[in-house]
UniProtKB/Swiss-Prot annotation:
GO terms for biological process: mRNA pseudouridine synthesis; tRNA modification; tRNA pseudouridine synthesis. The active site is at residue 47. NCBIfam families: TruB (TIGR00431). This is tRNA pseudouridine synthase B. Belongs to the pseudouridine synthase TruB family. Type 1 subfamily. GO terms for molecular function: pseudouridine synthase activity; RNA binding; tRNA pseudouridine(55) synthase activity. SUPFAM superfamilies: Pseudouridine synthase, PUA domain-like. Disulfide bonds: none annotated. It is an enzyme of class 5 (isomerase).
Length: 312
């Protein structure tokens, strides 16, 4: 007897504008319920305090979420100088207060020091896991556990505003960068302490900012569909981006129809014009149907690694 599905089969990526005050997993579950999707996964957690772009993959798109986890991010952040908190943001308790004696040039010089590659020790108040539990669970119990420094890259950090004890910046960084840690380190560098009061993710990979939708907008569309006696799918599905947008940074290899079946059965194939190495995005035929991602093997062939399964 076939297993009964717990949701509908729907594939794509929705760019959720996560509200403040809820976890990324809570936001994911709300979107999954609204779409009635069988499978869903997000592509990199945001702090409950943070808002902004949270790409959520539905269906077969979940197979490619790691590529978005590994992609560059952009954040807009407001920091308050003069107060250091135990979480490095305004959700925590103030643990130190110091006077602010910072001028514009000193601030610019300190900010510039964060550009480039560096080692960053993740905050105890992060979603990274230690022995199967998020670090923040240990932190809330007053337990500190060992964390290894991780290589991060800050490609750009720009000062947008400096008024009184408030600093507003935009940061373009690699995966795994903790903006709260940057702000805390900046505060110590300035000698006055600092913590995050607003954090908004404004970019993931090359996804367009204007395609984000809020939970309120999604709920309103569902309610309107019910009033109009329309299928929810008819109003929500057009908001989805194609699943291959998760891997559009990879070079494309287009295979002829005769090779599509071989690829879909997991066989490596020779494709003229393919790169000499690395990961590739595989499409098939003149319509460039997205088949999945592959890797150039030692024989120069395109070897499929993660494939899309279409249909029921």
């Amino acid at each position: 007897m076939a297993r009964r599905r717990k949701g509908r089969v729907i594939h794509g990526v929705i760019l959720l504008d996560k509200p403040t005050g809820i976890s990324s997993n809570d936001a994911l579950q709300k979107v999954k319920r609204l779409y009635g999707a069988e499978k869903a996964g997000h592509t990199g957690a945001l702090d409950p305090l943070a808002t902004g772009m949270l790409p959520i993959c539905l269906g077969e798109a979940t197979k490619f979420s790691q590529f978005l986890l590994d992609s560059d991010k952009r954040y807009r952040v407001i920091a308050k100088l003069g107060e250091r908190t135990d979480t490095s943001d305004s959700d925590g308790q103030v643990v130190q207060t110091r006077p602010v004696h910072v001028d514009y040039d000193t601030l610019l010089a300190c900010i510039a020091k964060f550009r480039g590659e560096t080692d960053q020790v993740p905050s105890m108040f992060s979603a990274l896991k230690y022995q199967g539990r998020p670090l923040y669970e240990y932190a809330r119990q007053g337990i500190e556990v060992p964390r290894e420094a991780r290589k991060i890259t800050v490609y750009e950090i720009e000062l947008h505003r400096f008024e009184g004890d408030e600093v507003e910046m935009e940061v373009h960084c690699s995966k795994g960068t903790y903006i709260r840690t940057i702000v805390d380190d900046l505060g110590e560098m300035l000698g006055c302490g600092a913590h995050v009061t607003m954090l908004r993710r404004v970019g993931v990979a090359n996804y367009p900012y204007e395609r984000m939708v809020t939970l309120e907008q999604l709920n309103a569309l569902v309610e309107q569909a019910h009033r109009d006696e329309k299928a929810v799918a008819d109003v929500l599905d057009p908001l989805l981006l194609p699943m291959d947008t998760a891997v559009e940074a990879l070079p494309e290899v287009n295979v002829i129809p005769e090779l599509m079946t071989l690829i879909q059965h997991g066989q490596a194939v020779q494709v003229s014009g393919a790169p000499s190495d690395g990961m590739v995005r595989i499409t098939g035929g003149e319509q460039k149907l997205f088949l999945g991602v592959g890797e150039i093997d030692d024989n120069g062939k395109v070897a499929p690694k993660r494939l899309v399964v279409y249909g029921e």
